[in-house]
Swiss-Prot record:
Overexpression of Rob confers resistance to cyclohexane. SMART domains: AraC_E_bind, HTH_ARAC. It comes from Salmonella typhimurium (strain LT2 / SGSC1412 / ATCC 700720). Signal peptide: none annotated. Keywords: DNA-binding, Repressor, Transcription, Transcription regulation. This is Transcriptional regulator Rob.
Length: 289
């Protein structure tokens, strides 16, 4: 395997082990090289020092935990292998220009300081556009669930499948446009979990005959950044992770309060049973510029 292939595999492995001990000796042993050779190879291929990259990714993961859970700051610091809250706070402030406590309390979420994961090889950054929406009345059903930060990606995919299945269970066909409104906040009951509220909804004029027991929902107007995904529905969650983990930091955007909007345009209007359908998804995040 060439050097780029070795480092590509190593980057994937690192991403899944950021909360594990990752001394350069451990990482070099995993890669099968001497510590010195691995450091040089990593720098040659990526342009980054491996130790600084690991620390920046750990701090980025800890930033997400600060925003989406109520875990004590010390617990987050220890989870991402900092030896004390003081050491963590100093490193965090250097990367994010504010303390962990202030970062957690802010009413808005700036992507400044988040270090996206390095990717080698084929990767196209999703295109974006800035849009202003008007208040839009919808009819929908809101459900909620709680999960840990580590479970959230799998849970969100499974939740979407189940909630849409429930929502459209009595409809004869798939409507031409569907809305998923998503809001996440720290759980009030467990400090290591978050509560996710997900609303499946349709424009009011389309709702007749499609859904039962829906309630009025307001899609709030304002400025959003929009990213578009096309493909199988099973790929939506990975796309959203890319938007938050890579696109928002690259654009240095600030997320304001509000719901994320998933606007779906299915390319098939017939139900397919358990088979995933092709669709276009416009994913909109409320922002302040």
């Amino acid at each position: 395997m060439d050097q780029a292939g070795i480092i590509r595999d190593l980057l994937i492995w690192l991403e899944g082990h950021l909360d594990q001990p990752l001394s350069l000796d451990n990482v070099a042993a995993k890669a099968g090289y001497s510590k010195w050779h691995l450091q040089r190879m990593f720098k040659d291929v990526t342009g980054h020092a491996i130790g600084a990259y690991i620390r920046a990714r750990r701090l980025s993961k800890s930033a997400v935990a600060l925003r989406l859970t109520a875990r004590p700051i010390l617990d987050i610091a220890l989870q991402y292998r900092f030896d004390s809250q003081q050491t963590f706070t100093r490193a965090f402030k250097k990367q994010f220009s504010q303390t962990p406590a202030l970062y957690r309390r802010s009413s808005e979420w700036s992507a400044f300081g988040i270090r996206p994961p390095l990717r080698l090889g084929e990767f196209t950054v999703p295109e974006h556009q800035f849009v202003t929406l008007e208040d839009t009345p919808l009819l929908g059903v809101t459900q909620s669930y709680s999960c840990s930060l580590e479970q959230i990606s799998d849970f969100r995919h499974e939740m979407r499948v189940q909630f849409w299945h429930d929502f459209l269970g009595h409809s004869p066909t798939i409507p031409p446009v569907l809305y998923g409104l998503n809001e996440t906040r720290p759980s009030m009951e467990k400090d290591d979990e978050q509560e996710v509220f997900y609303t499946t909804a349709l424009p009011q004029e389309q709702a007749d005959g499609y859904v039962q027991s829906a309630h009025p929902v307001l899609l709030q107007g304002g400025e959003y950044v929009m990213f578009t995904y096309e493909g199988l529905g099973t790929g939506v969650q990975d796309f959203i992770l890319t938007v938050y983990g890579t696109c928002m930091p690259m654009l240095n955007l600030t997320r304001r309060k509000g719901q994320d909007i998933e606007r779906y345009y299915p390319s098939e209007d017939t139900k397919t049973g358990d088979r995933p359908i092709n669709l276009r998804c416009e994913f909109l995040i409320p922002i302040r510029r």
